[in-house]
Amino acid sequence: MMAKPKKTIPAKLSDERIVIYDKDGISRLNEKRYGELHENFLSLSYVEALYLVAKDWVLIRDKKNKILSFEELHEIAHVIDKKLCIRYLVYKDLRNRGYTVRTGLKYGSDFRLYERSNIDEVHSKYLVKVFSEEIPCEISEITGFVRVAHSVRKELVIAIVDADGSVVYYNMGYLKL
């Protein structure tokens, strides 16, 4: 006999994030390391929300109470974040591989990445910076990311998304000779 699927978690579109007030939904998502927990709600980034909508875990309503499809949410989010497409592909790939992925904004990166084996870790091991194969990047820019990652005792992972949406990861750092 198949287990009864859990109910879809209701969420609301806020100005620059998705907000969940449903206590059961907050508990379920927080347990799986999604979102940022606040006193009486859980907030999701657009990338997290897109991932959860694609999996039918959340149902997002806009300010007029209209249910947003994946495509509609993507369109709204893309206005705010021009790198949304490639960030989403990397987020989805890492989550599907079993990693816990959090925003890396305060480190100047796209994501913080936690080891799969220890999701209760307080500190992430990696910072992930996302690039498109189609847009050139200066080596000085990458050097700056390596320097920041090193200064906060994290390893830098460069995620490059190609035209087909495939992701390749490179570990960047200092080499002591």
Curated annotation (Swiss-Prot):
Pfam families: tRNA_int_endo, tRNA_int_endo_N. It comes from the Archaea. InterPro entries: tRNA_endonuc-like_dom_sf (IPR011856), tRNA_intron_Endo_cat-like_sf (IPR036167), tRNA_intron_Endonuc_cat-like (IPR006677), tRNA_intron_Endonuc_N (IPR006678), tRNA_intron_Endonuc_N_sf (IPR036740), tRNA_splic (IPR006676), tRNA_splic_arch_short (IPR016442). Transmembrane segments: none annotated. It catalyses: pretRNA = a 3'-half-tRNA molecule with a 5'-OH end + a 5'-half-tRNA molecule with a 2',3'-cyclic phosphate end + an intron with a 2',3'-cyclic phosphate and a 5'-hydroxyl terminus. Keywords: Lyase, tRNA processing. One of its GO terms (biological process) is tRNA splicing, via endonucleolytic cleavage and ligation. SUPFAM superfamilies: tRNA-intron endonuclease catalytic domain-like, tRNA-intron endonuclease N-terminal domain-like. Its EC number is 4.6.1.16. The active site is at Y114, H123, K154. GO terms for molecular function: lyase activity; nucleic acid binding; tRNA-intron endonuclease activity. One of its GO terms (cellular component) is cytoplasm. It is an enzyme of class 4 (lyase). Homotetramer; although the tetramer contains four active sites, only two participate in the cleavage. Therefore, it should be considered as a dimer of dimers. Belongs to the tRNA-intron endonuclease family. Archaeal short subfamily. HAMAP family: EndA_short. NCBIfam families: endA. Endonuclease that removes tRNA introns. Cleaves pre-tRNA at the 5'- and 3'-splice sites to release the intron. The products are an intron and two tRNA half-molecules bearing 2',3' cyclic phosphate and 5'-OH termini. Recognizes a pseudosymmetric substrate in which 2 bulged loops of 3 bases are separated by a stem of 4 bp. This is tRNA-splicing endonuclease. The gene is endA.
